[in-house]
Amino acid sequence: MLRLFLRRFTKALLWFAGGSVLLVLVFRFVPPPGTALMVERKIESWVDGEPIDLQRTWKPWDEISDDLKVAVIAGEDQKFPEHWGFDLSAIKAALAHNELGGSIRGASTLSQQVSKNLFLWSGRSYLRKGLEAWFTALIEVFWPKQRILEVYLNSVEWDDGVFGAEAAARHHFGVGARSLSRQQASYLAAVLPNPRVWSASHPTAYVSRRAGWIRQQMSQLGGDSYLLTLNDSRRAPWAQ
């Protein structure tokens, strides 16, 4: 009985591994039609009895403001061009901070956020964290950094039911994603820790301060030219 269970379990794992690799390879070239988070939001709205129309329009890399690309990296993951999906120094800092109590600090990279938004459900279980690590490793192996950021910008939530840079730009500022100004981009990046509570178009004092800090970081990183580092070769994971 145990042997039969182990055989079936092993077969299921192999099917899952193969299927997930295939899915990641497909999305390397094909725009994902939606995300797991979008499905979750739709289900939540049905359960609450308040249906919402999800807003999302996929835009390729060249049709998204470079300022937004740099702003998101500056605000969310400044080591994005260097790491292989996991920022070990940020993880250590978050663990040390959380041990002191108070608010919980996260350490998710852009790659990890793509993994959980695209493929997984919300939550903090060990199973979900394990699957997040698996999908993060896959996209880091099979996707270039530019593709990871492109998918991120087209899938992240920027208000309740508003997904992706194009929908966010039109929802908050009435312009397309390619026309976002540096200031507008910084406000969109500033609300990403909690986009359903904070608003890029009606910012609180804290969001305005954070947007100002992001603009400073964008300048320190080198502005648009920083995007060229996405093509640089990275050190091997074990050398970091």
Swiss-Prot record:
Membrane topology: Single-pass membrane protein
Classification via Pfam families: Transgly
Reaction(s) catalysed (UniProt annotation): [GlcNAc-(1->4)-Mur2Ac(oyl-L-Ala-gamma-D-Glu-L-Lys-D-Ala-D-Ala)](n)-di-trans,octa-cis-undecaprenyl diphosphate + beta-D-GlcNAc-(1->4)-Mur2Ac(oyl-L-Ala-gamma-D-Glu-L-Lys-D-Ala-D-Ala)-di-trans,octa-cis-undecaprenyl diphosphate = [GlcNAc-(1->4)-Mur2Ac(oyl-L-Ala-gamma-D-Glu-L-Lys-D-Ala-D-Ala)](n+1)-di-trans,octa-cis-undecaprenyl diphosphate + di-trans,octa-cis-undecaprenyl diphosphate + H(+)
UniProt key word Nucleotide-binding: no
Keyword line: Cell inner membrane, Cell membrane, Cell shape, Cell wall biogenesis/degradation, Glycosyltransferase, Membrane, Peptidoglycan synthesis, Transferase, Transmembrane, Transmembrane helix
GO molecular function per UniProt: pentosyltransferase activity; peptidoglycan glycosyltransferase activity
GO terms for biological process, alphabetical: cell wall organization; peptidoglycan biosynthetic process; regulation of cell shape
Compartments, as annotated in UniProt: Cell inner membrane
Cross-referenced InterPro entries: Glyco_trans_51 (IPR001264), Lysozyme-like_dom_sf (IPR023346), PBP_transglycosylase (IPR036950), Pep_trsgly (IPR011812)
Membrane-spanning intervals of the chain: 12-31
EC numbers, comma separated: 2.4.99.28
Pathway participation: Cell wall biogenesis; peptidoglycan biosynthesis
Recorded coiled-coil stretches: none
Gene3D superfamilies xref list: Biosynthetic peptidoglycan transglycosylase-like (1.10.3810.10)
One cellular-component annotation, GO: peptidoglycan-based cell wall
EC category name: transferase
Similarity comment: family membership: Belongs to the glycosyltransferase 51 family.
Reported function: Peptidoglycan polymerase that catalyzes glycan chain elongation from lipid-linked precursors.
Name of the featured protein: Biosynthetic peptidoglycan transglycosylase
The gene coding this protein: mtgA
